[in-house]
Regions:
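Aromatic-lined, polymer-binding surfaces characteristic
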Residues: 120
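N-terminal leader/auxiliary helical segments
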Residues: 11-115, 123-298
Length: 298
C-alpha cells in the first residue's frame, strides 16, 4: 500500500509539471506503438528493413520527445523541459539536425530506425492534436481522458483487454539504445536518456490498475491530494465513456489517414538523407494543436 502511494505521488507531481508546461497530460502509448506497426506494413521492404532489424530503437522512436517527460518527473528540469519545449516548436529544425547526426554515425541504420519511428510520432501528433484540442473545448473532457479512451478503443478493436494490457513492454531501456538516442537531443547524455526510459516504464507501472484493489489505492491517493478530477483520466477506466464514442470514431479516421502520410514522409526523409534534396515542408509545423484548431468542425 505504501509503495503504491509513493508511486502515485511521484506521478502526480510529474503530471502537474506536464499540465503547466504543455497544457496536456501524459501521452498515449498503445496508439503510437500500434501506429508504428501499421506504418511499417505499408513501407517498401528496402526502407522497412532498417526498422525491423533495429526494432527496439524504432519502437522507442514512436514516442518521440515524450520519453523526456519521465526524467525525474516530480521535479522541473532541463531534460523534461526539452521534451515539453519541442512540442511547441516547429519540427523542421529538429529533423534537419537529425540528418546531420545520422550522417556522422558509424551505424547509420540504427539512427535511421530511431528517427523513422520519431517521424511516425510527429505525424500522428500533428494530425490528431488539433482535433483533440477542439474536443476538449467542446466537451470539457481532459486531454488525458480523451487519449486514454482512444487507447481503450484501439485495444478493444484489436481484441486486447484494456485493463490488463501493459503498455510499455516494448520499451527496452538499455544503455545501448540510450547511446544511439542521446545525440538527437540537445546536451543529453546516454545516462539521462536511459533514466527517462526507465522512468517511463515506472510511471506506467504505477498507474497500471487491472484489479479493484490497485485501482482503489490509486484513486484514493488522488482524492487524498485533491487531484482526482485532474488525473483519474490517466488510469484506464473499467468501462468506456459514452461521451467519447464519437470522438474515438473521428480519431480512428484521422489515424487511418495518417498512416499514408507517415509512410510518405519517411520515404521523403530517406531521400533527404541520401540525396541532395530539400527537407519536406510537412515538417514545418509543431507536434501540438497549432493555431487553427478553433476553426475545426467536429
Amino acid at each position: 500500500m505504501i509503495r503504491y502511494k509513493i508511486s502515485f505521488e511521484i506521478i502526480t507531481a510529474g503530471e502537474f509539471w506536464v499540465e503547466t508546461e504543455r497544457g496536456k497530460s501524459m501521452p498515449t502509448t498503445y496508439t503510437h506503438y500500434r501506429f508504428g506497426k501499421d506504418v511499417l506494413e505499408v513501407l517498401p521492404r528496402r526502407i522497412r528493413a532498417a526498422m525491423e532489424t533495429n526494432r527496439e530503437l524504432f519502437d522507442i522512436g514512436l514516442h518521440g520527445p515524450d520519453i523526456l517527460f519521465y526524467y525525474y518527473a516530480p521535479v522541473p528540469n532541463a531534460v523534461s523541459g526539452q521534451g515539453f519545449g519541442m512540442h511547441r516548436k516547429m519540427a523542421d529544425p529538429f529533423f534537419a539536425k537529425a540528418a546531420q547526426v545520422i550522417a556522422g554515425a558509424e551505424d547509420q541504420a540504427k539512427k535511421r530506425a530511431y528517427i523513422y519511428g520519431f517521424i511516425c510520432h510527429f505525424v500522428l501528433d500533428s494530425e490528431c492534436h488539433p482535433y483533440i484540442e477542439k474536443m476538449i473545448q467542446k466537451s470539457g473532457i481532459s486531454h488525458s481522458e480523451i487519449e486514454m479512451e482512444f487507447d481503450r478503443y484501439l485495444l478493444s478493436k484489436d481484441g486486447k483487454d484494456p485493463l490488463t494490457y501493459k503498455q510499455t513492454e516494448h520499451i527496452a531501456a538499455t544503455e545501448e539504445n540510450a547511446q544511439v538516442i542521446a545525440p538527437f537531443f540537445e546536451n543529453l547524455t546516454e545516462k539521462q536518456v536511459q533514466k527517462a526510459l526507465k522512468g517511463m516504464k515506472l510511471c506506467h507501472q504505477a498507474l497500471y490498475a487491472p484489479g479493484k484493489r490497485k485501482r482503489n489505492l490509486v484513486f484514493g491517493a488522488m482524492k487524498i491530494v485533491r487531484q482526482y478530477d485532474r488525473f483519474h483520466g490517466l488510469v484506464m477506466s473499467e468501462t468506456a465513456n459514452p461521451q467519447c464514442e464519437q470522438y474515438c470514431l473521428l480519431l480512428d479516421k484521422l489515424y487511418e489517414g495518417a498512416i499514408s502520410v507517415a509512410a510518405d514522409l519517411v520515404m521523403k526523409y530517406q531521400n533527404y538523407l541520401l540525396r541532395d534534396c530539400e527537407l519536406p515542408k510537412r515538417f514545418h509545423c509543431t507536434f501540438g494543436a497549432g493555431e487553427e484548431w478553433e476553426e475545426l468542425v467536429l
